[in-house]
Amino acid sequence: MRRNGMLLPIASLPSPYGIGGFSKEAYEFIDLLEETGQKLWQILPLGPTIYGDSPYQSFSTFAGNPYFIDLDTLAEKGWLTKEACEASDYGDNESYIDYGRIYNSRFVLLKQAFLNSDILSDEKFTEFCKANQHWLPDYALYMALKNQNDGKSWIEWEEEIRLRKPEAVEYYKKELEEECNFYEFLQYEFHEQWTKVKEYAHEKGIQIVGDVPIYVAFDSADTWANPELFQLDEKNLPLGVAGCPPDAFSATGQLWGNPLYNWAYHKKTGYDWWLKRIAYCFDLYDIVRIDHFRGFDEYYSIPYGDETAVNGHWEKGPGMDLFNTVKEKLGELDIIAEDLGFLTESVFQLLKDSGYPGMKVLQFAFDPSEDSDYLTYKYQRNCVVYTGTHDNDTTAGWFEKLSDGDKEVALRYMNSFYTPKEEQHWDLIALAMRSTADTCIIPVQDFLGLGSEARINMPSTLGDNWKWRMTKGAFSEELKEKIRRMTKLYGR
């Protein structure tokens, strides 16, 4: 079935409170998707972000980001006043997220809502906590301990609790009980609000495409609570960390720093943790994009403490053994494999054996020196085509920066030599939509024709990433009609 969708992170939704969330603006965006004939809404990972604000680095692979909890909903329940919500300082630029101000203001309001609630006597809250015993108590205690330790990584905590000695764990559970309850409350409220957004999307015929990073952060509840899942030494320090080797784009490679999985242990336990993780993802989403799919075939291991990725080496991943177990235990799932970058024959074979659709990004297609696999005439139906992803420039910004040679290839392929410069992004959108790919997803910024100022992320940089927000009323009626006509024209 041919289908079309838009890519827009939850954080990038309009909001009067500094960052997008599960507010009326989320419901309005779903209405827009329906009006324009879309069937999919792709978002980025929903976890609570750490330093750098990347959704791909989170304090937990199971937890949700409290920033997305709608304050107006809490006010409607009588747990906050509208005045308190409006009085907080969220920054003064509706096009960008000021994470520093959000951090300083949001948790004050959320704590106030918790103290004003009677959540601990709510049966639904109790049921939620029971249903999530495999991760929620550890996460809540981890966050409470992190606060008590002034935000330090768990590796810097006192040895007894760092190594989770049973007496220390029991002591801090009692000592920090109220703070633990607060973090459980946040997860309950996150889940309740997100479930309603997802249900509304289903009413409108929209499916949610979620995103799952292959790795977890070292400074996370996952690593602290489950060190046996990872390649750690007797002090729970990593033996090796994740990244990518040197290539034409980087002489020293990429050093991500995530702990690597102890795949022998995962196999011995029947991949129990992975089954729980993937099942939980499909509770949150309808379709799941798995990031860095090639890491399940082979993963790059860099010695812990190295400052670059130069001394890394490749190790074998679980391959189809993991995905056969997933299919056996969870059934056939709607998974998208992120298979971008340099791939070996064994990765292609893993993708073929899994049956999952891979990704095609048109911004990678127009190299005059090679016949790119990203050119649309090479597509099989079982793939997902994008003009660009969150890691790419916007299409308008990309056109601006293309070399003369690449631009000529792109314009020739799209037959766009006579298209006005300010309209060229539409030619790339049309190229994606009319391709044979079953699924087509377009970033919102491309439909809006925005330049590099609206780019979500510049990989391997810190500072101005993950900040862009769509402004209220960005889609005119004329623009919505144009998208609807194109979607219908190309059978999506």
Set out the residue ranges of the language-model regions.
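Alpha-amylase-like alpha-glycosidases and glucanotransferases acting on alpha-linked glucans and related
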Residues: P9, S15, D53-Q187, V216-I441, ...
